[in-house]
Swiss-Prot record:
NCBIfam families: PRK06299.1-2, rpsA. This is Small ribosomal subunit protein bS1. One of its GO terms (molecular function) is structural constituent of ribosome. The gene is rpsA. Keywords: Repeat, Ribonucleoprotein, Ribosomal protein, RNA-binding. InterPro entries: NA-bd_OB-fold, Ribos_protein_bS1-like, Ribosomal_bS1, Ribosomal_protein_S1-like, S1_domain. It holds the Pfam family S1.
Length: 568
């Protein structure tokens, strides 16, 4: 029993029987206080208020002293209050009590119940810490992670600080004294209900007002209040927009039309250009194919240049349609942004929203004029513009080039060797061999200025003719031969016999005559390609035809013997 109680009751008993008083005092000493434990909340009575201290009796040997500052509302003597027992007996023998901790214990209990039920708790964001914010839950401090502040990043968090607002308790650890709360969960739940309501009303064709929430390369996300929609780059304007940031700003208010609603995936596609009439509906009439007009260069691309047809509408001039003579040239080299150019309409594709234009077709094709003045067979003189490994390029005027392939330089000599004898700037004579206006190519030749020396040979030694030739050289790859002492010929190793073991050049001797069949003539060199094998096969087939089939009683050897005898 506390000393104060003794002081209050024992003197009053002094008038009583001394023995009774002594027994009563002992009884008070033996009052059971075992149910009172440290770190628990108990009820106590205020027995005295002294200066800044409130003395509370909780039924222990000693009273406890609590600073007035721990009480929000000051109690009076005799009031019963809940207190937290820190220590039953401190260093000075007094019981250490705390009203503040008792309140927190009570609040913790309430918060635990609310957390288990999923109920929201009111609190105030009052400070910033690493990774988030601190929240006052009526006396208990909780942690609000940065990721749980809002459904989207907040640039200025001061707008939500020092305001009483609801939070959801995510986790509690009484041992560590940690509470984690979420503001975002409240917003999401509220947003989810509003979102479901909004989605139930969404219909294609609806016009809504929203706020630009995010801008990407492919479009912008529009906040419609409780749900987001995607405004694709191609649905911002009927004209060309390279990037959404060219016409939209973050947090900008915009009017949009619902152009598609995917109910299954809850996706909303939005459009701004659909709020205006489609200019393409009248474009075919306004810009008919073949119409020649002028416009300003607005932008460049790897594949061409864009020209403004009218406000909000552009057409494309492909690289191949800029110049007649420089196919797929870089438009940046000849044109500048803002430059006024003349063009002609090639095609209007209303489905793909494309207008194809041409600059070069506003002028006469210089190659067409060249072809008219220099038909195939014409002999011209032109300066050498460039020399490559495969031929010579000559200047034809008006930035046109003609090409002499190395194979068209000489009938007899190798063209690649002759290229070294020509110099850039030299004027040479050549003949027009072919003109391809579509491909913008002019083929020329030098050797065609003189007759083909092998034409006579080609006429005399036609394919299939049987000739006799003199062996002039034996090589691993075959035999070099001479026909009529003037025309060179060659028999490949594989053409020496129809028997593989006889296809050996070393079996033949120089200056010996050999009979073979003309297989082909190399036009560039005039060399005749011959075949002994083809000749023998032809002879065999002829013999079979004249003397009968090998299925008869006469054997093949007899047939061939008879054929050879007749030849004699």
């Amino acid at each position: 029993m506390s000393i104060k109680l003794k002081q209050r009751f024992v003197p009053q008993l002094a008038a009583m029987n001394h023995e009774f008083a002594e027994d009563f005092s002992k009884m008070l000493e033996t009052v059971d206080t075992s149910h009172i434990k440290e770190k628990t909340v108990v009820k106590g009575q205020v027995i005295e208020i002294k200066n800044d201290i409130i003395i509370v009796d909780v039924g222990l040997k000693n009273e406890g002293r609590i600073p007035k500052s721990e009480f929000l509302a000051l109690p009076e003597v005799g009031d019963v209050v809940e207190v937290f027992i820190e220590k039953i007996e401190g260093r000075n023998g007094r019981t250490i009590l705390s009203r503040e901790k008792a309140v927190k214990e009570e609040l913790w209990g309430q918060l635990e119940i609310m957390c288990s039920k999923g109920e929201f708790v009111d609190g105030t964001i009052f400070g910033r810490v690493k990774g988030g914010f601190t929240v006052d839950l009526s006396g208990v401090v909780a942690f609000l992670p940065g990721s749980q502040v809002d459904v989207r990043p907040i640039k200025d968090p001061t707008s939500i600080m020092n305001i009483k607002q609801p939070f959801k308790i995510l986790s509690m650890d009484k041992k560590l004294g940690n509470i984690v709360v979420s503001r975002r969960a409240i917003l999401e739940e509220s947003r989810s209900e509003a979102r479901d309501e909004m989605l139930s009303k969404i219909k294609e064709g609806m016009v809504l007002e929203g706020t630009v929430k995010n801008i990407t390369d492919y479009g912008a996300f529009i906040d419609l209040g409780s749900v987001d929609g995607l405004l694709h780059l191609t649905d911002i304007s009927w004209g060309r927009v390279n990037h959404p940031s060219e016409v939209l700003d973050f947090n900008q208010k915009v009017k949009v039309m619902v152009i598609k609603f995917d109910e299954k995936n809850k996706r909303i596609s939005l459009g701004i250009k659909q709020l205006d009439s489609n200019p393409w509906e009248a474009i075919k009439e306004e810009f008919p194919v073949g119409k020649q007009m002028t416009g300003k260069v607005t932008n460049f691309a790897d594949y061409g240049v864009f020209i403004e047809l009218k406000d909000g509408l552009e057409g494309l001039v492909h690289s191949s349609e800029i110049s007649w003579l420089k196919s797929n040239q870089n438009p940046r080299k000849t044109l500048t942004i803002g430059q006024e150019v003349e063009f002609v309409v090639l095609e209007v594709d209303t489905e793909k929203h494309r207008v194809s234009l041409s600059i070069k077709q506003c002028q006469e094709n210089p190659l067409t004029k060249f072809a008219e003045n220099n038909p195939v067979g014409t002999i011209i003189k032109a300066p050498i513009r460039n020399i490559t490994d495969f031929g010579i390029f000559v200047a034809l005027g008006n930035n046109m080039d003609g090409m002499i392939h190395e194979g068209d330089i000489s009938w007899e000599d190798k063209g690649t060797d002759l290229l070294k004898s020509y110099k850039k700037g030299d004027e040479i004579e050549c003949k027009v061999l072919a003109i391809n206006i579509e491909k913008e190519q002019v083929s020329l030749g030098i050797k065609q200025l003189s007759p083909n020396p092998y034409q006579e040979i080609s006429d005399e030694y036609k394919k299939g003719t049987i000739v006799k030739a003199l062996i002039t050289e034996v090589k691993d790859e075959g035999l070099e031969v001479l026909l009529n002492d003037k025309v060179a010929g060659f028999i490949k190793r594989t053409e020496l016999s129809d028997e593989k073991d006889e296809q050996k050049p070393e079996m033949f001797q120089i200056d010996k005559e050999i009979e073979a069949k003309v297989v082909s003539i190399e036009k560039s060199t005039g060399r005749i390609l011959l075949s002994v094998k083809a000749h023998k096969i032809a002879e065999r087939q002829k013999a079979l035809k004249e003397y009968g089939s090998s299925d008869n009683t006469t054997n093949m050897g007899d047939i061939l013997a008879n054929a050879l005898e007749d030849k004699k």
